[in-house]
């Protein structure tokens, strides 16, 4: 039987939850009153209730955070030593295989909830004798119904208390291999959106096991709210964190729409050439999937017509022309549509004397369009020459991860100021291509933004949080000011 430690800490209506699994209690922090008393309230799942009382419930309206169908994966044959915010300690014993559920006499918050749950969720919805508090025909002498009841009790308790910060310390082969955040879901299928809730995950388990675990399928169902770190595999609410992992600082990919929202003032974005789509100019043939089908599937996935969004807007009140590439659309590859949209954007910025920002995120030229995609490099570079040399206008290039191939070889490195995100992968040829061609190992980190900055290929590395302010100051330094000076931030 494994022993587990729960540390409940209440702060601003939020309970911080931490669990550790270990074979012995010696390795845990000081524990008060951890011995199990003889006088325990016992529920035998093959019999009846013992010790349940009638109390009103105040947990009826809480959101469900733990699914009852998953709770058995988390709790099976375990003793939990629990300490609440008042430092009161008590133990809970679950053994679903042997159909037993026991808690000691020092129940505190958990006892009250189980009392309340049984009286409100089960006893109030049936007829019974006023003198018979143990009679519960809803719970039959079958293993499945009893297990369901235990699951429901635990489920309902966790849905009102479970939170955040979970890490597993067990080296036991019997310890559960799943993270607690896999259970954070509701009956309506939506994850709780409260700003008081964050998820932090610490683990010393093998990362390959985590990557292969099916536990991470949660991001497929809730990717509009939550995003998973590629580096430490923790979950975070992406709207709050701007896709930056708060545990390891790893920068995750952002969509073009998210970057527009990051840089452009609300309500000022005016897109350009939204209806421009590729017509498969060279009739590219593929055995796996026709080019047109790939375009259609990428459009359905991203909601975009191609791998770049262009338009005008205001950045802290300063009118700007902005183009943002989207890596989710066929790897941000540059085809004829991408090249044409960027070219038209630069020409418009030239005519209107607007500062220009291009946010790069691309795998290079799109091979399905052959030499037409390669010609976009020359076309964009040509209009940039007129914009920068003839009109003396200001162009900022922002390189994100990854920026490679034809984009790096053309407009990506032509900015008057070249800014990169931290840890961005920036290269012409990828590491694998170089190693296969030259038969030499590429040093780790040699194609990262930090390495390029040391070699003078970049002007600055700017995190996402201050990026908008930095760009605004650069524009003002080059005599581009807000339309309304009160909008300066």
Swiss-Prot record:
Cofactors, names only: Zn(2+)
GO CC term, one of those recorded: chloroplast stroma
Keywords per UniProt: ATP-binding, Chloroplast, Fatty acid biosynthesis, Fatty acid metabolism, Lipid biosynthesis, Lipid metabolism, Metal-binding, Nucleotide-binding, Plastid, Transferase, Zinc, Zinc-finger
Binding-site positions, Zn(2+): 229, 232, 245, 248
A GO biological-process term: malonyl-CoA biosynthetic process
Domain CoA carboxyltransferase N-terminal, residue spans: 225-489
Pfam families reported in the protein's UniProt record: Carboxyl_trans
InterPro entries found in the cross-reference section: AcCoA_carboxyl_beta (IPR034733), Acetyl_CoA_COase_Trfase_b_su (IPR000438), ClpP/crotonase-like_dom_sf (IPR029045), COA_CT_N (IPR011762)
Catalytic activity: N(6)-carboxybiotinyl-L-lysyl-[protein] + acetyl-CoA = N(6)-biotinyl-L-lysyl-[protein] + malonyl-CoA
Function: Component of the acetyl coenzyme A carboxylase (ACC) complex. Biotin carboxylase (BC) catalyzes the carboxylation of biotin on its carrier protein (BCCP) and then the CO(2) group is transferred by the transcarboxylase to acetyl-CoA to form malonyl-CoA.
Protein name: Acetyl-coenzyme A carboxylase carboxyl transferase subunit beta, chloroplastic
Gene for this chain: accD
